[in-house]
Amino acid sequence: MRHHRTVLPLAGYTIQQIDFDPATFQPEDLFWLPYHASLSGWGRKRQAEHLAGRIAAAYALREVGEKRLPAIGDQRQPLWPTPWFGSISHCAQRALAVIADRPVGVDIERRFTPQMAAELESSIISPAEKTALLRSGLPFPLALTLAFSAKESGFKATPAANQCALGFADFQIVDITASTLALEFAEQRYPLHWIASEEQVITLCALQQ
């Protein structure tokens, strides 16, 4: 599958970005994944997205001298080789991956339009969180996209044993600035950093062990 790699530094971490062309994907492209047989029943689009994410993950692991690839869990989540933590995200024809020595989550989202923000607001944030978003001075659709993405990143950084029953309401946006956000979950503060383009936002959450 044809793809292009870009390296994005953010908050001291290196995000591997893969822009890929799903039209060039062939099923045999999956053969380099040890578990490729388990993907045979997936749709072509999903297979291409999965491959792009694992390509990004391979580059991320290579940065720390790790040759093993993430395995795949029973919920299709990546299982990172010990002692590393990692995270993968997809949006359209782009995949991201990051590796760290501590729990980490990365997320990429397409920026909400004003109409989408109006429709989705109540399912993403509480009235108190809306106050925090409005206080940031950012355009509300951008701030809401960041809130959505931050909660996704926070979820990914949360230990797997605690993820099962979590929803957006469990993570509270308490602060947002021109480059950072803060979530609260179970009396713990989750620090995040973000960057944005005209079309997308990326958030990164790294926790202390």
Please identify what each model-predicted range represents.
Residues 1-209:
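Core catalytic alpha/beta fold that binds nucleotide/phospho-ligands
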